């Protein structure tokens, strides 16, 4: 049994928070991609990268209930983008397994909709920004009139 199946990604129903159920459904879908999914030369996202994405999101949203799941977007090169677009802001966190170590490479771009400020970073700086901003942009906003 793969680690994804052990996490409940195989399709088995578990008592999970809404955001985690949505995240794991997205992971399940991506785990089924085959070579050539995005045209000649495209490669599927490896299981280890999907597991890293789940780890990053779970770590950032730990203890939070009223949040939305990010969208996981595959790259044709086997990379993965974790993204949120919300009233509060945007994050596009790119991860791949092409680096020199087990962590691969990570980078982030984001925008705070309240201030209009944009931010970006790579490596450890990107991880720190992701941990800081993921809980902010993932929070469900009940007030649709929340100013930007």
Q: What are these model-derived regions, one by one?
A:
Residues 1-71, 77, 101-148:
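Eukaryotic low-complexity, non-globular regulatory regions
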Residues 88-90, 101:
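Long, acidic/polar E/Q/S-rich protein-interaction regions used at subunit-assembly interfaces
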Residues 90-92, 118:
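Short, mixed charged/polar active-site loops
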Residues 73-77, 85, 94-98:
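Short beta-strand micro-motifs enriched in acidic
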